[in-house]
Amino acid sequence: MTSIEFIIPSVLTKGSGEKKIPLDATDLQDAFTKVTEQLGEDFKRKVLDLSGKPRSLINIYINGKNMRFSNDGMATKLNNGDSIYILPAVAGGSDLKNEDLQRYSRQIMLDEIGFVGLEKLRKAKVCVVGVGGIGNPVVTQLTAMGIGKLKIVDRDIIEISNLHRQHLYTEEDIGKVKVEAAKARLEQINSSVQIEALPNSVTKYTAENIVKGFDIVVDALDSIDARYALNDACIKLNIPLIYAGALGMLGSICTIIPNKTACLRCIFPALAEDDMPTCSTEGVHPSILYLVGGIQVSEVVKIVLG
């Protein structure tokens, strides 16, 4: 019997670290059969299809050589001392780098995301309008999850009163433009994400140009007039819009799918800017901002993954 080593990356072991399993096996099929017997049904479901063959998103390496296009396939004979390494691939067959596997391993493990979901996230283009109290956790989480392109829009300057709830910023950032400081910090979190910073106001004249070309828009604004303008632009351009607001200890979230759900004007048909309470007058608990921002991120991911 041939003695070999079967190496499984941590992304396929529920985060318990890379496993190196010694086996006696004659060929690849024999090796896969024995390793799945050891690791159980959950592992088997992740790497093998119903016919018992490796799934199309699993690359197999013997001594560093990719065996996907080997003529012998799963009947490839093994030699003493061979090392088998399996590496997940993303849709289209391109390999994930090992660094990516480590960075995103905890979300790849989720059946709801997986490798295909990660690739969809890496291709998605999301525009977040407002990088204040709600926008901070939204852009941080989207960046950390590996969204492909992120546009952040806000005209405001960082003030000391922002710091208790807007945790992308520090005391050294006071006086800086929010989107510029946020972009610099987000690029430190994940340099692979393409980030565009736009220090502009959102009005009925600018909204369409701001969101055009994006897959999803996140409303993290604090002005009802700007919210209406953003809503109207997304409805016209058929772009999903995820609204959220928070004040005091309360928050609200609404996902708007053009031509399928109610829009912001349907829900709030006649709100006036001068009548709206704000964080400046009413206050806000930081935790509620993370709750509603987290739900917005969850809604973004659901739309991206389909």
Predicted segment positions?
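Ubiquitin-like/PB1-type beta-grasp interaction modules and other compact soluble beta-rich domains
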Residues: 1-95
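Adenine nucleotide-associated cytosolic modules
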Residues: 95-306
